Amino acid sequence: MKKIKTLCGVLALLCVGMMPVSAQNVLKFNADKKFKIVQFTDVHWVPGDSASEEAAERMNEVLDVEKPDLVIYTGDLVFGKPASEALSKALEPVVSRRLPFAVTWGNHDDEQDMTRIELLEYIKDMPGNLTSTTAGISGVTNYVLPLKSEDGKKDAAVLYVFDSNAYSSLKQVKGYDWIRPDQINWYVESSVGYTERNGGKPLPSLAFFHIPFPEYNEAAQDENALLIGTRKEKACAPLINTGLYAAMLNAGDIMATFVGHTM
């Protein structure tokens, strides 16, 4: 992903009817069934860079105006050394407000002086952090954020966060990595479990990851597609399609996906 100097075009505001995290880190609907998620992506923080400071100003402006209940960063927070400083600065607008937040890594985050696991460990105890991991599958930042009903008695919606990895490890395949089959199996199994516990009806769900799947480019090429916003480049998707979009369609729960990586 090319270096992005500002946050223009990388912000999504999602209004999906929920409320802030409690002291026990439980997300749930509130009485008026409103909740706001702000998505930040590709902050590309470089310590000492004026463009990074400008990005912080834009994030602060958004948070002050929107007053979100949850913030999700979809990758490429870190773009310079030391990674710990870059990551802290990229998260500071949220952490300073003690807002609930969740993170997934992009292809650039672990290119400096910390691994994905080290980055995850670094933010573990930050106030409001909901980022987690699932052992035994590819990637690091794969986890589920269930959203409870307003009375807290049942699951009412689900947020799926995927680690889309970084670059292809296959010599014959160039470019970016993809969400692996074991990650898709994890999603399907999780989705089936939530559906079964909901009496056979899929729970409304959203998915967040960094590198878009190939269907993003296919959708943009559809002459009947309604594209909102500014599209400065193609989706920079992986060359291999592992079927995540198809799995989501079959599960019937994902209402929308939110990614980063492109302008």
Identify the residue ranges that each predicted region occupies.
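Acidic/histidine-rich helix-loop elements
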Residues: 38-56, 77-85, 111, 117, ...
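Bacterial N-terminal signal peptides
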Residues: 8-17
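His/acidic metal-ligating clusters that form di-metal
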Residues: 67-69, 158-160, 173-262
